[in-house]
C-alpha cells in the first residue's frame, strides 16, 4: 500500500487550524477526521504544541527511514525546482506513481510493454472513436477538430498499437497530428516527468516547420503535465542547453542543432527515448543533412524505440534512412497513390506565358489588384527576395520577406506576423515551401519556376489546406520554359493557362528604370538579385527546359530595372549547389568551367 504524502492543500489546512481558522467547511468535516503525516495517524483536533512535537519527531525518524520511503518524498518535491518557462509541475494526482523510480536526472521508466495505449475497433472516422485520454481529447477539442483526415485515420491506430510507420501524404493532409497524438499518449501513459528526460523527439528540416510543430504540440499538450521544447539553429544555444538539462519530455529540433546537443550537452537526458519522428525526411536529406541524420540515429537508443518516418517522396536516400532507423517490418502507408491528381482537390492551378521583360510589370499589376488577398510569392534565391522586397516596399506596395539569409529572430517574427495577418503579401524562397501551415492563403505565385515537379507540389501546398480547403496558384513561364508543362502532366498536376489582357498590365517600366538608375542602394540590390537569378537558373536540375544559354539577357535585365544588362562578375560553374544530383550521375564534373566561362564571355559582349 503506498504511503500517503502531505499535499500542499492539506498542509495549508493545518496552518489555518493552527492559527485559529475553522477546521472545515463541508458537512463531512463536522466530526474529527484522521490526518496522515509520514505514515502516522493523528487527530486533527490536536493542539498546536502537540503537532509541533510530533512533526519534530517525524523529521528525526525520517532520516532513519528506508530508501524506498525517501524516494517517495523526493519525488513529490523534485519538480518544484523546475523552470516555469519550459518545465511544468506534474499534477498532484500523479505523485503516487513515482514510487520505486530512480532519484535524480534520467530516472528509468517502465517498459512500453507494461502500459497499454488506447486501441480501436474497425476504422475510426472521428477523434472521439480513438479512446484517447481525456486530457488529449480536451486539447483536440480546443483546436476545433472532430473528424480525422485520411492520413490520420490510417496512421494513428497502428501508431497507438506500437507499430513503426513509413508514411507518405500530400502536404496539408494533417500528418502533424498523426504523429503527435500517439506520441503524447505514450508520454502520458508512462507518466513522464522532467527528470526522465526526452521521451519523444521530432526532427524537422527547417526552423519554421519546427516552430509550427512546436505550436501544434503546445495546443495539444495544454492539459497534460509533460514538458515540451524546441532546439533550432540560430537560437540561443546556452538557453536551450539549460532547458534540456531541466528536462524536456517532447522535443522538436532541426538536425544540425540536435546533433550538437546530443554530442555536447552533458545534462541532456535521452536514454529514455521511446518515440522518434522524422518529418519531411526527403527534404531533410535534400538540404544536406544526410550525414547528421545517420549520426543522430546511431547515437539515439534503439531499444524499445518506435519510429515514425514521413516523406512526400520515396527516394533511394529516404529508403536508406528508413532501413537504419525503422525496426524490421514497418507499416507503409501511402494515401496518395490512388488519387487522380498529385495536388489537393480544392486547388485551382494555372500558368501564364510572359516575356522576361514583362514579368515584374505583371507581378506588380497582380499585387496591386489583390491588396485585400493573402498571397505568397516564390523566388529562386535570397538576393532576388531581398531586391524585390526592398523595391516593392519603396514604391508603397508593402510586403514581408522570408529567406535563409535572415537572422532567426527575424524569420520567426515574419513567419508569425504573416500567419496572423488576414491579408498581405509574403515573398520568399523555398524555405517556406515545405510543411508550413499558414492559414487562409488565397494565392500562390511562382514568380521563378520551381526546381522540379516535387517543389511545385510543395509550393502550391501552402494554399487549399485541410478538409475542403480552397485556393489558387499561378506560375510565371517564359516562352522558352513551356516544356515544364509536360513534366507537370507526367506528375499528374492539372494546370490551365490563364490569360492577362495587355491593357490590364500597369506599365511602370520607365519609372522603374529611372528609380534603379538614380537610387544607389536599390541599384546595388538589383545587381545582386540579377546575378543570383542567373546563378539559380544555371543550377536548375531540368537543364533541358531551363537552359541559361537560351535566356535573353536584355529582357532579363529590364525585368530587374536595367535599360541594359549590368556588367557583373559571375562564374556559374563553381557555385552550383544543386548540380550534385547531376555530378553523382556522372553527367558533369564538379568545378568544371566550360559552360560558366562561355556564358561569361557572352555576357561581357552584351
From Swiss-Prot:
GO biological process: maturation of LSU-rRNA from tricistronic rRNA transcript (SSU-rRNA, 5.8S rRNA, LSU-rRNA); maturation of SSU-rRNA from tricistronic rRNA transcript (SSU-rRNA, 5.8S rRNA, LSU-rRNA); snoRNA release from pre-rRNA
Motif (DEAD box): 279-282
PANTHER family: RNA HELICASE (PTHR24031)
Family annotation (CDD domains): DEADc_DDX18, SF2_C_DEAD
Keyword Hydrolase: yes
GO molecular function ontology, one term from the record: identical protein binding
Upper lineage: Eukaryota, Fungi, Dikarya, Ascomycota, Pezizomycotina
Pfam family, one: DEAD
Subunit and partners: Associates in the nucleolus with the 60S and pre-60S ribosomal subunits.
Keyword Hydrolase assigned: yes
Gene3D superfamilies from the UniProt entry: P-loop containing nucleotide triphosphate hydrolases (3.40.50.300)
Gene designation per UniProt: has1
Recorded family membership: Belongs to the DEAD box helicase family. DDX18/HAS1 subfamily.
Subcellular location: Nucleus, Nucleolus
Organism, scientific name: Aspergillus niger (strain ATCC MYA-4892 / CBS 513.88 / FGSC A1513)
Polar residues: compositionally biased ranges: 583-592
Acidic residues bias (residue ranges): 75-100
Ranges of Basic residues composition bias in the record: 11-21, 597-606
Motif (Q motif): 125-153
Region annotation (Disordered) ranges: 1-125, 574-606
UniProt feature, compositional bias: Basic and acidic residues: 58-74
Main location: nucleus
Domain characteristics, as noted in the entry: The Q motif is unique to and characteristic of the DEAD box family of RNA helicases and controls ATP binding and hydrolysis.
E.C. no: 3.6.4.13
Biological role stated in the UniProt entry: ATP-dependent RNA helicase involved in 40S ribosomal subunit biogenesis. Required for the processing and cleavage of 35S pre-rRNA at sites A0, A1, and A2, leading to mature 18S rRNA.
Keywords assigned: ATP-binding, Helicase, Hydrolase, Nucleotide-binding, Nucleus, Ribosome biogenesis, RNA-binding, rRNA processing
Protein name per Swiss-Prot or TrEMBL: ATP-dependent RNA helicase has1
Catalytic activity: ATP + H2O = ADP + phosphate + H(+)
Amino acid at each position: 500500500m503506498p504511503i500517503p504524502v502531505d499535499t500542499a492543500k492539506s498542509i495549508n489546512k493545518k496552518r489555518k487550524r493552527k492559527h485559529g481558522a475553522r477546521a472545515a467547511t463541508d458537512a463531512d468535516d463536522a466530526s474529527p477526521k484522521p490526518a496522515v503525516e509520514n505514515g502516522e495517524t493523528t487527530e486533527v483536533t490536536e493542539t498546536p504544541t502537540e503537532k509541533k512535537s510530533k512533526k519534530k519527531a517525524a523529521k528525526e525518524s525520517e532520516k532513519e527511514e528506508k530508501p524506498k520511503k525517501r524516494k517517495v518524498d523526493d519525488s513529490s518535491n523534485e519538480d518544484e525546482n523546475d523552470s516555469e518557462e519550459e518545465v511544468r509541475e506534474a499534477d498532484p494526482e500523479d505523485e503516487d506513481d513515482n514510487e520505486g523510480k530512480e532519484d535524480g536526472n534520467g530516472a528509468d521508466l517502465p517498459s512500453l510493454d507494461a502500459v497499454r495505449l488506447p486501441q480501436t475497433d474497425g476504422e475510426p472516422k472521428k477523434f472521439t472513436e480513438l479512446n484517447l485520454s481525456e486530457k488529449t481529447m480536451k486539447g483536440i477539442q480546443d483546436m476545433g477538430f472532430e473528424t480525422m483526415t485520411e492520413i490520420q485515420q490510417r496512421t494513428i491506430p497502428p501508431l497507438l498499437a506500437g507499430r513503426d510507420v513509413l508514411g507518405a501524404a500530400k502536404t496539408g493532409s494533417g500528418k502533424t497530428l498523426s504523429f503527435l497524438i500517439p506520441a503524447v499518449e505514450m508520454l502520458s501513459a508512462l507518466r513522464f516527468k522532467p527528470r526522465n528526460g526526452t521521451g519523444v523527439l521530432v526532427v524537422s528540416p527547417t526552423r519554421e516547420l519546427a516552430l509550427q510543430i512546436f505550436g501544434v504540440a503546445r495546443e495539444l499538450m495544454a492539459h497534460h503535465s509533460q514538458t515540451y521544447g524546441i532546439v533550432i539553429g540560430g537560437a540561443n544555444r546556452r538557453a536551450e542547453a539549460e532547458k534540456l538539462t531541466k528536462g524536456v519530455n517532447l522535443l522538436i529540433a532541426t538536425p544540425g542543432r540536435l546533433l550538437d546537443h546530443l554530442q555536447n550537452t552533458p545534462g541532456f537526458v535521452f536514454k529514455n527515448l521511446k518515440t522518434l519522428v522524422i518529418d519531411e525526411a526527403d527534404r531533410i536529406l535534400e538540404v544536406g543533412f544526410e550525414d547528421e541524420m545517420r549520426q543522430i540515429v546511431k547515437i539515439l537508443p534503439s531499444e524499445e524505440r518506435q519510429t515514425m518516418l514521413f516523406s512526400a517522396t520515396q527516394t533511394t536516400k529516404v529508403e536508406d534512412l528508413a532501413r537504419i532507423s525503422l525496426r524490421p517490418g514497418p507499416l507503409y502507408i501511402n494515401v496518395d497513390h490512388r488519387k487522380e491528381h498529385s495536388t489537393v482537390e480544392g486547388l485551382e492551378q494555372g500558368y501564364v506565358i510572359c516575356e522576361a521583360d514583362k514579368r515584374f510589370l505583371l507581378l506588380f499589376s497582380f499585387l496591386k489588384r489583390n491588396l485585400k488577398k493573402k498571397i505568397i510569392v516564390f523566388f529562386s534565391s535570397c538576393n532576388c527576395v531581398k531586391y524585390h522586397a526592398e523595391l516593392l516596399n519603396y514604391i508603397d506596395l508593402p510586403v514581408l520577406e522570408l529567406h535563409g539569409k535572415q537572422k532567426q529572430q527575424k524569420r520567426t517574427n515574419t513567419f508569425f506576423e504573416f500567419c496572423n495577418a488576414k491579408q498581405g503579401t509574403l515573398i520568399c524562397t523555398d524555405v517556406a515551401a515545405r510543411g508550413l501551415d499558414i492559414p487562409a492563403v488565397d494565392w500562390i505565385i511562382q514568380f521563378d519556376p520551381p526546381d522540379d515537379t516535387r517543389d511545385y507540389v510543395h509550393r502550391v501546398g501552402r494554399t487549399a489546406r485541410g478538409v475542403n480547403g480552397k485556393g489558387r496558384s499561378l506560375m510565371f513561364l517564359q516562352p522558352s520554359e513551356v516544356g515544364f508543362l509536360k513534366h507537370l502532366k507526367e506528375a499528374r498536376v492539372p494546370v490551365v493557362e490563364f490569360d492577362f489582357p495587355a491593357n490590364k498590365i500597369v506599365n511602370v517600366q520607365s519609372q522603374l528604370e529611372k528609380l534603379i538608375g538614380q537610387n544607389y542602394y536599390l541599384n546595388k540590390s538589383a545587381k545582386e538579385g540579377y546575378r543570383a537569378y542567373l546563378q539559380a537558373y544555371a543550377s536548375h536540375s531540368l537543364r533541358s527546359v531551363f537552359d541559361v544559354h537560351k535566356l535573353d539577357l536584355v529582357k532579363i535585365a529590364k525585368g530587374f530595372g536595367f535599360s541594359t544588362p549590368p556588367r557583373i562578375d559571375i562564374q556559374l560553374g563553381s557555385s552550383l549547389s544543386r548540380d550534385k544530383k547531376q555530378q553523382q550521375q556522372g553527367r558533369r564534373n564538379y568545378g568544371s568551367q566550360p559552360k560558366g566561362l562561355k556564358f561569361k564571355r557572352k555576357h561581357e559582349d552584351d
